[in-house]
Curated annotation (Swiss-Prot):
It comes from Rattus norvegicus. The modification Phosphoserine is found at residues 76, 79, 82, 88, 124, 178, 283, 296, 514, 520. Belongs to the MPI phosphatase family. InterPro entries: MPI_Phosphatase, Rhodanese-like_dom, Rhodanese-like_dom_sf. Residues 278-289 have a biased composition (Basic and acidic residues). One of its GO terms (cellular component) is cytoplasm. Its EC number is 3.1.3.48. Residues 262-274 have a biased composition (Low complexity). Phosphorylated by CHEK1 on Ser-76, Ser-124, Ser-178, Ser-283, Ser-296 and Thr-508 during checkpoint mediated cell cycle arrest. Also phosphorylated by CHEK2 on Ser-124, Ser-283, and Ser-296 during checkpoint mediated cell cycle arrest. Phosphorylation on Ser-178 and Thr-508 creates binding sites for YWHAE/14-3-3 epsilon which inhibits CDC25A. Phosphorylation on Ser-76, Ser-124, Ser-178, Ser-283 and Ser-296 may also promote ubiquitin-dependent proteolysis of CDC25A by the SCF complex. Ubiquitinated by the anaphase promoting complex/cyclosome (APC/C) ubiquitin ligase complex that contains FZR1/CDH1 during G1 phase leading to its degradation by the proteasome. Ubiquitinated by a SCF complex containing BTRC and FBXW11 during S phase leading to its degradation by the proteasome. Deubiquitination by USP17L2/DUB3 leads to its stabilization. PANTHER family: M-PHASE INDUCER PHOSPHATASE 1, M-PHASE INDUCER PHOSPHATASE DUAL SPECIFICITY PHOSPHATASE CDC25. It catalyses: O-phospho-L-tyrosyl-[protein] + H2O = L-tyrosyl-[protein] + phosphate. This is M-phase inducer phosphatase 1. The gene is Cdc25a.
């Protein structure tokens, strides 16, 4: 048989179609080098093994069978049943084999599960002829660029059951993408025809195979997933898109109770605490249908609306020691209007001043206290005059105590603190000439030392005030409460030396104070 020139990219091993030579002794065939000629070691070994007895060689067959089989297939191709295409096609191939939609060439053997390619030669020989004819027709396709097949969403398993049964009958016509061409056992067709088809070895393909499809050679990652058809969208979901927006009720800050407010006034008026905390009622359109919650509500009998309990007040560990009436007063008050120990609100009406962290009172409030207006609520009313002694002697508020040094104030107030009794308060008011520097600084110092000497939030003097405008403004408005009824400024020409002396003393004491604080911090380390 005369063959044309083979293309350079295809490597094939060709043998001359000559009559089979006479058999030689086994020892010479096995070890002789003259037989090998110019063949490669692998080819020599293949020819030698085929000529051995007991391995299905040609010598076991009659002479006429050997002559006819040598024209169709050489012995060297018997070990190539896996599809490596080392032989040329035979002349007896029929045209009907072209219609076979074989899509994989370099693939696994057909009988991989349960058998060996060497033991199934009769069936593989017929397949090799089909493979060789397809190679000759489509040998230029190997030069084309290989592209992986794009994954396609698999259809439902139930929709392809009938199609899978048809495909399983003929494994070569419509083979699955993810399975090789020779992956199934010999009884595959019997199983599929009997109806006991199992998808274990034949995964379902998302799309029916065709002759033009290119097999990717990889396992389809989308196979084996139990995907169901999209269920019909419930009507409650459509209401989320079509229903109007539901606005939550805005919370009014004016009606909301404070941090320490009690629920009694809120519940008596319009139950503001319940309105601020209670969830908004869900509409019937928002609630999904067919849920477990709906099931339980239908099974249980309908009950009358039970009024929701009022909001429990926030409890604080610092308020456990106070009586019930005091705690109620705390809840009624705004947290910003509570005194230092958070036990009650401020007694006096405060005004804005230079320092936002301090509470200021007007000269009129000071005069009303001196007139005894709050005598039933106040046990002790202490006025600390923070001016220098020459200023205090020039005129001061009746009953005021002149303490211009921090150590003097600490010894007067904190060494022997004044204890309130009978529910009455102890109030301390600080002032200087303008109540801009010395008075506010002294007020902060007393609060700081009081905090250090007590467990938070307890204080000896929880209610501290600063007189707005100082002694100068009070003298102009309430001169009758001044003693003597005069006013001496700090920068008086007759007391320049006294001013220098007191300032130096104050600065020295301030420097010593900073040193003492530094020493105390070092001791703590």
């Amino acid at each position: 048989m005369e063959l044309g020139p083979e293309p350079p990219h295809r490597r094939r091993l060709l043998f001359t179609c000559s009559p089979t030579p006479a058999p030689q002794p086994t020892g010479k065939v096995q070890f002789g080098a003259s037989r090998a000629g110019g063949l490669s070691p692998v080819t020599n070994l293949t020819v030698t093994m085929d000529q051995l007895e007991g391995l299905g060689s040609d010598y076991e067959k009659p002479m006429d069978v050997r002559n006819s089989s040598s024209l169709q297939r050489m012995g060297s191709s018997e070990s190539t049943d896996s599809g490596f295409c080392l032989d040329s096609p035979g002349p007896l191939d029929s045209k009907e084999n072209l219609e076979i939609s074989l899509r994989r060439i370099n693939c696994l053997p057909q009988k991989l599960l349960g058998c060996s390619p060497a033991l199934k030669r009769s069936h593989s020989d017929s397949l090799d002829h089909d493979i060789f004819q397809l190679i000759d027709q489509d040998e230029n396709k190997e030069n084309e660029a290989f592209e992986f097949k794009k994954p396609i969403r698999p259809a439902s398993r139930g929709c392809l059951n009938a199609h899978v049964h048809e495909e399983s009958k003929d494994p070569f016509t419509h083979r699955q993408n993810s399975a090789p061409a020779r992956m199934l056992s010999s009884n595959e067709s019997d199983i599929s025809e009997s109806g006991n088809f199992s998808p274990l070895f034949t995964p379902q393909s998302p799309v029916k195979a065709s002759l033009s499809d290119e097999d990717d050679g990889f396992i389809d990652l989308l196979d084996g997933e139990n995907l169901k058809n999209d269920e019909e969208t419930p009507s409650c979901m459509s209401s989320l898109w079509t229903a109007p927006l539901v606005m939550r009720r805005p919370t009014n800050l004016a009606d909301r109770c404070g941090l320490f407010d009690s629920p009694s006034p809120c519940s008596s008026t319009s139950s503001c605490s319940t309105r601020a905390v209670k969830r908004a009622d869900r509409s019937h359109e928002e609630s999904p249908r067919g849920t477990k919650r709906r099931k339980s509500s239908e099974a249980s009998p309908v009950k009358a609306d039970v009024p929701e309990p009022t909001q429990l007040p926030h409890q604080s560990l610092s308020l456990t020691s106070f009586p019930k009436g005091t705690i109620e007063n705390i809840f009624h008050s705004d947290p910003r209007d509570l005194i230092g120990d958070f036990s009650k609100g401020y007694l006096f009406h405060t005004v804005s001043g230079k320092h936002q962290d301090l509470k200021y009172i007007s000269p009129e409030i000071m005069a009303s206290v001196l007139n005894g207006k709050f005598a039933n609520l106040i046990k002790e009313f202490v006025i600390i005059d923070c001016r220098y002694p020459y200023e205090y002697e020039g005129g001061h508020i009746k009953g005021a105590v002149n303490l211009h040094m921090e150590e003097e104030v600490e010894e007067f107030l904190l060494k022997k603190p004044i204890v309130p009794a009978d529910g009455k308060r102890v109030i301390v008011v600080f002032h200087c000439e303008f109540s801009s520097e010395r008075g506010p600084r002294m007020c902060r110092y007393v609060r700081e030392r009081d905090r250090l000497g007590n467990e938070y939030p307890k204080l000896h003097y929880p209610e501290l005030y600063v007189l707005k405008g100082g002694y100068k403004e009070f003298f102009l408005k309430c001169q009758s409460h001044c003693e003597p009824p005069s006013y001496r400024p700090m920068h008086h020409e007759d007391f320049k030396e006294d001013l220098k002396k007191f300032r130096t003393k104050s600065r020295t004491w301030a420097g010593e104070k900073s040193k003492r604080e530094m020493y105390s911090r070092l001791k703590k380390l």
